[in-house]
């Protein structure tokens, strides 16, 4: 996935794997990170896509146009990836619909993501809208 997004320096690959594995060993059992995979049912089955959600606590806030406050965690959709040969075949949409259903079942009403150019149309079809979010990456 990260190679497809741009250059991943070879010296960072092993560290990325190790640190991510350590994070997931801690976050998955606590329910802080939720994960989905899509499989090809060939024998043996192979993973053809995946996606994750990180839950984070945020302060209560007003909901524009609503009478109640927005409470509870915010879901950040991360690492949505489909193997290139499986793209444009509904795998990404199936992953996202599974995520949205699971989050709705948990009562999570605020979901954010950072859309790639390739994924933007899918997210818009699912009801996501562009916002005014900005980012600073201090050096």
Task: Name each region found by the language model.
Residues 43-79, 87:
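Conserved acyl-donor/pantetheine-binding loop and adjacent beta-alpha core of acyl/acetyltransferases
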Residues 12-41, 58:
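Active-site rim helix/loop that mediates acceptor-substrate recognition in acyltransferases
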Residues 86, 90-98:
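Conserved acetyl-CoA pyrophosphate-binding loop and the N-cap/start of the following alpha-helix
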Residues 1-11:
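Helix-loop element at the rim of GNAT/NAT acetyltransferase active sites that forms part
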């Amino acid at each position: 996935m990260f190679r497809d997004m741009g250059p991943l320096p070879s010296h960072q690959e092993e560290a990325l794997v190790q640190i991510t594995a350590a994070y997931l060993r801690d976050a998955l059992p606590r329910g802080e990170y939720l994960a989905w995979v899509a499989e090809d049912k060939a024998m043996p089955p192979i993973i053809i896509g995946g996606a994750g959600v990180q839950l984070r606590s945020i302060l209560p806030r007003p909901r524009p146009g609503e009478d109640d406050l927005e409470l509870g965690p915010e879901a950040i959709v991360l690492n949505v990836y489909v193997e290139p040969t499986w793209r444009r075949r509904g795998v990404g949409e199936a992953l996202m619909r599974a995520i949205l259903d699971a989050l709705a079942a948990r009562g999570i009403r605020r979901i954010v993501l950072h859309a790639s150019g390739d994924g933007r149309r899918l997210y818009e079809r699912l009801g996501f809208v562009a916002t005014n979010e900005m980012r600073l990456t201090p050096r």
